[in-house]
């Protein structure tokens, strides 16, 4: 049964809402060994690990054009239509995030500005094997393509027969992925970080994965950039008397089925709703194929918090800083300005979180574990870098030379001062 708490200032939210985290201790040594091995032996190591972990011995790591064409020929046409629809929505949303160069001209001949450039080579990890997550392909590849990355490399584990599922290949092609490789796990992160005979080294790696992939991303950070280290999934629902208990329970369980560590929290001003949702969660749990996973999540990470008013509800939500926040209230737009910490916000009674997972348009790669207090969803910004530039005319430099020299001398950097003063010696 999901635990219900009556909120007061005496409630220790830190303790009551402590979220479980993946434990990396058991995989550190294994991941470090894999990274070193791939760095040293390249493709040979990748082929061996693919046989060991995925049960298939590959002759070629790269997906061919023939395989991609076969995917288009064999994919369920309704699914292809859904993938295209999702792609178009994601593209439309992320195009609004594009940043432009800017220029500032001053009368004394000084020109200042910023130029925006895409990260030239990016690598995307997509979970694979028997699991198909074309939405992950779209959410990572589309913003990279819009950013203008020269080369988008995708890695994903093969199935037991050495192929990649059609939905993954179709989503990749539609999104503009340039090359796809049949390799997963920590070994694929190593390949993207160091490069092999076949797989090029990239400058940034994005995409979710299991604990081995997450640990590998942590270890290679600095050699390359990474998007984020995602923790278990989470949802917090703020609900008032107008919320439907059946829908609210279903929304909690849509996250609970992800992972035994997923956090599912309802914050409500209605004791009636709290009681009904607790009963409804138990009822719906029995109807789920992934009941065991969802039940563990609900019983260990699930909470219903009853508050006196919306001020308390907002306080709890901002404290938690959830990955997904649902505002199951009559006037969500009135509440929105008060929400300071959330990855993605789902407004009103007809906006269940899975809309954001698949096709609404905003990115579903979101900060977890409270990091929404200082982090943002994946966006075009993650695939660009900005350079500032400075141009001073002789007149412009002369006007500020004494100030620069004064600053440099104050900091004890004589050579800094001389690099300016030397330009005015006769």
Regions found by a protein language model. Give the residues of each.
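Conserved NAD(P)+-binding/catalytic subdomain of aldehyde/semialdehyde dehydrogenases
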Residues: 176-254, 258-263
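N-terminal Rossmann-like NAD(P)+-binding subdomain of aldehyde/semialdehyde dehydrogenases
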Residues: 1-120
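Short internal beta-strands
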Residues: 150-160, 264-270, 348
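Short acidic-hydrophobic, aromatic-tinged amphipathic segments that line or gate anion-handling sites
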Residues: 2-8, 179-184, 304-309
